[in-house]
Amino acid sequence: MAARLEFEKPVIELQTKIAELKKFTQDSEMDLSAEIARLEERLSKLQDEIYKNLKPWDRVQIARLPDRPTTLDYIQYLFTDFFECHGDRTYGDDAAIVGGVAKYHGMPVTVIGHQRGKDTKENLVRNFGMPHPEGYRKALRLMKQADKFNRPIICFIDTKGAYPGKAAEERGQSEAIAKNLFEMAGLTVPVVCIVIGEGGSGGALALGVGNRMLMLENSTYSVISPEGAASILWKDSSLAKKAAESMKITAPDLLELGIIDDMIKEVKGGAHHDIKQQAGYIDGILKETLKSLLQLNAEELISQRYEKYKAIGKVSVEDQYIGVN
């Protein structure tokens, strides 16, 4: 069992030793249960110590793991009767965005999210989770449909950013993102956004204008990657770890700053260790969030959403607030 992340090495070493002792016990008549129990207790304490003191760069690495749960993974556990819709009715379909109608605890909802692959083959199909304009237009089509039929909208955010290629620019990437921001601000139904992995720049924000913004504990949300910030600030992308420390891109930091509304805890070691349990954590907060938003009428939902984003960018100077409008 190889450690994929540097800070996981002590955990992996102990897990490997426990596995070896268990195998030895099976292959021999020796009783090592006491030693195994002692090591398992030590492992639990070590995991608590490591995962409760993760640095921002550690969380960035967890958010990028190939086997981290995706939008479709969570749809499988959180929703029933999911029916995926395809195409933007203008150009084509984009596999980097998935969306459709489903039932959440019996209630009709619209679910939309970025979708990346878990291996090279799937990533090529999903364009590594980086949407083209048609992906964002598909998302907007589904949002307008939800608005028409009074269905709450749940958006899962997990992208490095919108695809920056020539073809995407020619088909109006910036316009597609801007149109989503504009239209989402005026939706008359509850909109809940959840960052489940990387939330990169405008590509993330195009699904991120909601009444509530939630983040998984080891996800990130930023205007640029740590590598990109390091390249701009210090002309050296290898200083990404330093950039991550100062950018305030993790859920704990963003919750403290008031950018997000709640942080969803992750299973020990990260969401990829137990998708079903992680979906349960999301379900608990999502259910309560929707319950509170469903008490608001259309005018109140729009007003609350407007005030939420208007408040971002205000700073206190000598007890006076200066708004960045």
Curated annotation (Swiss-Prot):
<comment type="similarity">
    <text>Belongs to the AccA family.</text>
</comment>
<feature type="domain" description="CoA carboxyltransferase C-terminal">
    <location>
        <begin position="38"/>
        <end position="292"/>
    </location>
</feature>
<comment type="function">
    <text>Component of the acetyl coenzyme A carboxylase (ACC) complex. First, biotin carboxylase catalyzes the carboxylation of biotin on its carrier protein (BCCP) and then the CO(2) group is transferred by the carboxyltransferase to acetyl-CoA to form malonyl-CoA.</text>
</comment>
<dbReference type="GO" id="GO:0005524">
    <property type="term" value="F:ATP binding"/>
</dbReference>
<comment type="pathway">
    <text>Lipid metabolism; malonyl-CoA biosynthesis; malonyl-CoA from acetyl-CoA: step 1/1.</text>
</comment>
<dbReference type="GO" id="GO:0003989">
    <property type="term" value="F:acetyl-CoA carboxylase activity"/>
</dbReference>
<protein>
    <recommendedName>
        <fullName>Acetyl-coenzyme A carboxylase carboxyl transferase subunit alpha</fullName>
        <ecNumber>2.1.3.15</ecNumber>
    </recommendedName>
</protein>
<keyword id="KW-0808">Transferase</keyword>
<dbReference type="GO" id="GO:0016743">
    <property type="term" value="F:carboxyl- or carbamoyltransferase activity"/>
</dbReference>
<dbReference type="Pfam" id="PF03255">
    <property type="entry name" value="ACCA"/>
</dbReference>
<dbReference type="GO" id="GO:0006633">
    <property type="term" value="P:fatty acid biosynthetic process"/>
</dbReference>
<dbReference type="InterPro" id="IPR011763">
    <property type="entry name" value="COA_CT_C"/>
</dbReference>
<keyword id="KW-0275">Fatty acid biosynthesis</keyword>
<comment type="subunit">
    <text>Acetyl-CoA carboxylase is a heterohexamer composed of biotin carboxyl carrier protein (AccB), biotin carboxylase (AccC) and two subunits each of ACCase subunit alpha (AccA) and ACCase subunit beta (AccD).</text>
</comment>
<dbReference type="InterPro" id="IPR001095">
    <property type="entry name" value="Acetyl_CoA_COase_a_su"/>
</dbReference>
<keyword id="KW-0444">Lipid biosynthesis</keyword>
<dbReference type="InterPro" id="IPR029045">
    <property type="entry name" value="ClpP/crotonase-like_dom_sf"/>
</dbReference>
<keyword id="KW-0963">Cytoplasm</keyword>
<dbReference type="GO" id="GO:0009317">
    <property type="term" value="C:acetyl-CoA carboxylase complex"/>
</dbReference>
<keyword id="KW-0067">ATP-binding</keyword>
<dbReference type="GO" id="GO:2001295">
    <property type="term" value="P:malonyl-CoA biosynthetic process"/>
</dbReference>
<keyword id="KW-0443">Lipid metabolism</keyword>
<keyword id="KW-0547">Nucleotide-binding</keyword>
<keyword id="KW-0276">Fatty acid metabolism</keyword>
